Amino acid sequence: MSTDGADGVDPTRESKSGTGPAGTDTTILRARDLSVSYGKVAALRGLDLAVEPGEIVSLIGPNGAGKTTFANTASGFLEYDGSVEYNGEEVAEIGQTELVERGMIHCTEKRDLFGHMTVEDNLELGAYLRDDDVLEERMAFVYELFPRLEERRGQNARSMSGGEQQMLAIGRALMGDPELLILDEPTLGLAPVILKDIAEAFDPILEQGVTILLTEQNVTFALEHADRIYLLENGTAVREGTPEELKGDEYIRDSYLGG
C-alpha cells in the first residue's frame, strides 16, 4: 500500500483513463442499493460502496457475506436489482466482454487456469483482447513482478504449487492491461512467502495506473495492504473506513482480530 497521501493513496497518481489524480476522478466502480439473490436466498441486500481510481479497496467478512457475489456482479456475471456502475455506466448495459475490453479484469477464486498449458501460454491467453504489440511489454512486466513465473515459463500450470498458480492467475489478469483489477480471495490458503510476493506486487501494479479491488477473508492482510476497507456481513456493508479507522473499531477488534 502506498503511503504518500493522507489516507494511504498517492494524491498525484493518475488513472489509466487519464482524467486526473485520484480523489478528483469519476468513481471507477459504484454500487447503490445493490441486491442479488440466488433463488429465494438473498446474497446482497441494499449494498452501497465505491471504489476510487488509484486505490486498493478490500471487501472483508466471513464466508457467505457477499464478497464473491459482489465481485461476480460487478464483472457482469449475475443479474441484480439496484445499481452497479463502471466508470459511470451501468454494468448490465455494458456486458461481460465489453467490460473486459474496457479494462475490468476479474481474477476469480478458482483461478481458471489451463493446467495442460505452459505458464507462458496461460499468460498469453490473458492478452487475447489486446493488440499484439503490447504482449511482450506486458509479459516482461509480469515476469518482473513474479520471477518464479519466468523461471517456470515452460512448465505446465498443473505441476505448479497452489501459490505459484495464484501468481500465474494474477499475472494472466495483468496481461489484459486492466484499469480495474478484481482479485477474489487471492491469498486464500497461501504460504507466507507467497503472500509476501503478492503484497510486494501491489505498488508496481498501482504505478501502472491500475485500481485494485480485493475480496479477503484474511483481515490482517487487508488491514496491512488496502487503502479502504468495507466489512460485509449478511450481504451488506456494516463498516467502512481506512485500516487505521477499522483497527480502532471495537467490533472489528473483538470479532475479527481476536480482541
Task: Please annotate each region the language model reported.
Residues 173-174:
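ABC ATPase C-loop
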Residues 60-62:
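The feature captures the beta-strand-to-loop junction immediately N-terminal to the Walker
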Residues 39, 79, 119-137, 145-147, ...:
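ABC-type ATPase nucleotide-binding domains, specifically the catalytic core motifs of the NBD
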Residues 181-185:
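Catalytic Walker B motif of ABC-type/P-loop ATPase nucleotide-binding domains
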